[in-house]
Every structure is written in structure tokens, then in C-alpha cells.
């Protein structure tokens, strides 16, 4: 199938007209600053807009600028981020904030190229900030823009391929509205998020690109964009130990690097243990189980791995230097990953 990249240029004017009437009302758009755009774009990575909004508003209330972000204790930062996942995003935000304060007078740099020198800011985020806040005509190419562009142009190349993405970026940069580059990027984002939906479910009847869209004209909306299949996730069974001693619950700090780095977790062991297995595992930790009670199961999906978890309450005696015994106040202050959300609720209820 022949690509029709000129369709992207033809889409620009009707797209902006559509956006002026149908653009989403979002808190980072109601008050626009480089800092707010930056934080929102980092939060929106791998996370739905509806889930981000309350986190964004809480974050802004406590950390309204780069100076506040640069100096907040990491434990508090991770607590504010708790539930959003991908915690390296929060750490990179703070690393970048420290550079912004020390090297840029507390204000984000004004060009796409200089923004990309900051920790955690890649091509997409830099382009979003530079176009929305500083008027730089550079396309912010994410999954939404790739999907719209693939369908409108009829390009059947794999959008996961780096060379193909580079090609898309060049054509989108050519199509961007020079007078309103930020609006163009936000319009394409909104079109992809609300109309040109993934998984063969676009709302073509209300799409401003319908008359110039190769996928619509040729019945290819279920096929485009072409995306290479991901590798199957590894499934890992874990037994989560909800341990209590003297009206306190056990938490353990994860390693400084890797998955969920430096966050608090419940002690756990690999495998799907029964009650006898739990007692043995506790003995190997230097603890003696007084009671062991199953609490149900939970599942959490990461990008490349899936945890199938089975939980147990256990009242224990003994000591283990890797464990921190938290009362209700300390437990509420600890940053605990969403993976343990179900178990955290059970522990919190028991600590009250």
C-alpha cells in the first residue's frame, strides 16, 4: 500500500478547528506553565489521564515549582507518587529539578535540545514542553500520534521500529502548525485518545480526518497501525507475608536499584506456599509463627513480568534486622507500591 504522507499536511487545519471545539479540559491546560506541563507529561507516561488528575493536583499543591521538588525528602516524594507506579519517573523528576535549580535559575530550559539534557526527559517530553510552552515547532510523537499518522497516511510499517518512528517524526514535523505547535500536538493527542482509538475501535464517524484517512477509505482501521507483538510476560508466583508483632506490621525496604527500587514492601518469598511452608519460611528468617492465616490472593502486572501473589497473616515472635516494624502512623507514611494495594488495605485495617 502506498503511503500518502501529504494527508498529514491536509489534516492540520481541520484538526485545529476540531480541537478548538472538542479539546479536553485538563488541569495542566487550565494553568499552563513549563513546570506543570513537565510534571503532567511524566505522570502520563504509562498511566491513564483519569488516574493522573488527582495525583497531579495533589503534587502541585505540595510541590508547586522546581525548587520545592528539588528539596522534598525522597520518602515524601515517593509517598506522593504512591499508586502511579514506575517510581523511577519520580526520582528522575527530582534529579532534573535539582539541575534546573542549580544550572537554570529554577526555570526549565526553553528549547527541545536543552530540555533533553535533563534526567528523565526524552524526545517526546522535551517536544511537548517546548511546543506547548515555548512555541517550538517540533512534534511530540507518542503512541497516539503514531496511531493517527499511520491510519491517515496508510503506512503499514511497524511503528515499534526505531527507523519507522524517525520517519513518522519527520513527516509530523513537516505537518505541524508553525503558529500553534503546542495546540497541534495536544490536538493530535486528544484525537488519538478520544476518537482514533486503538484496537480497531475508532470513532470514524466523528473524526475530522475521515475524508483524508487511508485506513478509513480502505477498511484498514483494524489493521493499522502495525505493531510487532510483544514478548509474553514472565509469570512469577510469590507468597506475601503480612507479619504482626506488638501491634506493629513488618515492612522491608527493597534494593536501591531494580524493580520498585527503595520502596517499602511486605516480606515475601518465591513460590505458592501453604501454611506449613509459611511457618518454615518464617523460621528461616529467624521468626517463630504463633498464628498463620490465609488472606487471599492478588495479581499485579508490570511491563515484563506478572506477579501472582498469595497472602498470609502471621503473628510472630523473634527478630530480623531486615524488617522495620511500623505502627499505624509509620505505615501510613511509608511509600508502598500499588502491587501490594490489596494487602496494604488489610494490614492498615488491622493496625487501626
Feature map (PLM): residue ranges:
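Catalytic cores of DNA base-excision repair glycosylases
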Residues: 3-9, 13-205, 209-222, 287-288
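Intrinsically disordered, low-complexity, charged terminal extensions of DNA damage-control enzymes
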Residues: 1-25, 30, 193-352
Amino acid at each position: 500500500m502506498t503511503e500518502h504522507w501529504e494527508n498529514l499536511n491536509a489534516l492540520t487545519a481541520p484538526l485545529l478547528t476540531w480541537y478548538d471545539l472538542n479539546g479536553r479540559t485538563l488541569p495542566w491546560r487550565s494553568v499552563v506553565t513549563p513546570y506543570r506541563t513537565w510534571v503532567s507529561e511524566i505522570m502520563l507516561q504509562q498511566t491513564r489521564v483519569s488516574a493522573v488528575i488527582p495525583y497531579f493536583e495533589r503534587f502541585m499543591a505540595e510541590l508547586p515549582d522546581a525548587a520545592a521538588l528539588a528539596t522534598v525528602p525522597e520518602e515524601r516524594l515517593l509517598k506522593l507518587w504512591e499508586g502511579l507506579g514506575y517510581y523511577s519517573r519520580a526520582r528522575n523528576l527530582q534529579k532534573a529539578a535539582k539541575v534546573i535549580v542549580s544550572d537554570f535559575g529554577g526555570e526549565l530550559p526553553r528549547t527541545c535540545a536543552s530540555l533533553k539534557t535533563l534526567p528523565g526527559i526524552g524526545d517526546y517530553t522535551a517536544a511537548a514542553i517546548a511546543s506547548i510552552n515555548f512555541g517550538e515547532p517540533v512534534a511530540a510523537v507518542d503512541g497516539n500520534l503514531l496511531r493517527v499518522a499511520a491510519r491517515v497516511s496508510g503506512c503499514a510499517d511497524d511503528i515499534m521500529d526505531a527507523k519507522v518512528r524517525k520517519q513518522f517524526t519527520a513527516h509530523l514535523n513537516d505537518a505541524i502548525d508553525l503558529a500553534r505547535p503546542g495546540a497541534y500536538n495536544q490536538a493530535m493527542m486528544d484525537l488519538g485518545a478520544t476518537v482514533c482509538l486503538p484496537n480497531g475501535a475508532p470513532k470514524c464517524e466523528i473524526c475530522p480526518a475521515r475524508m483524508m484517512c487511508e485506513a478509513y477509505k480502505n477498511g484498514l482501521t483494524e489493521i493499522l497501525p502495525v505493531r510487532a507483538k510483544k514478548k509474553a510476560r514472565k509469570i512469577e508466583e510469590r507468597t506475601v507475608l503480612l507479619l504482626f508483632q506488638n501491634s506493629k506490621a513488618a515492612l522491608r525496604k527493597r534494593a536501591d536499584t531494580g524493580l520498585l527500587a527503595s520502596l517499602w514492601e511486605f516480606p515475601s518469598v518465591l513460590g505458592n506456599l501453604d501454611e506449613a511452608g509459611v511457618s518454615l519460611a518464617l523460621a528461616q528468617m529467624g521468626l517463630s509463627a504463633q498464628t498463620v492465616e490465609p488472606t487471599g490472593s492478588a495479581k499485579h502486572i508490570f511491563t515484563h513480568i506478572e506477579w501472582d501473589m498469595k497472602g498470609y497473616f502471621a503473628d510472630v515472635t523473634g527478630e530480623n534486622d531486615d524488617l522495620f516494624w511500623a505502627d499505624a502512623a509509620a505505615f501510613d507514611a511509608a511509600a508502598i507500591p500499588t502491587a501490594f494495594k490489596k494487602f496494604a488495605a488489610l494490614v492498615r485495617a488491622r493496625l487501626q
